Amino acid sequence: MVKKSFIPVISQEKKEENPGSVEFQVFNFTNKIRRLTSHFELHRKDYLSQRGLRKILGKRQRLLSYLSKKNKIRYKKLINLLDIRESKIR
């Protein structure tokens, strides 16, 4: 159900963005995170997938921090588009 809601956004992203761009990678990681989160509602003790989720969260966080340092405008636009929280500043 989560996968179907992102199909129009994916098609727009593929036309406009390079698959290697930071925005596209963050978008794909966010998709995976949402799919895994819905998976954990049924399979609470799937610890291997929980580890994978933590790894994906870390990768997305590193990409977002890179983007926020390089271009704040693109970072804010991406955060609003994906409806995710802004990272805390250390």
Curated annotation (Swiss-Prot):
It comes from the Eukaryota. SUPFAM superfamilies: S15/NS1 RNA-binding domain (SSF47060). This is Small ribosomal subunit protein uS15c. Keywords: Chloroplast, Plastid, Ribonucleoprotein, Ribosomal protein. HAMAP family: Ribosomal_uS15_B. GO terms for molecular function: structural constituent of ribosome. Belongs to the universal ribosomal protein uS15 family. It comes from Lotus japonicus (Lotus corniculatus var. japonicus). CDD domains: S15_NS1_EPRS_RNA-bind (cd00677).
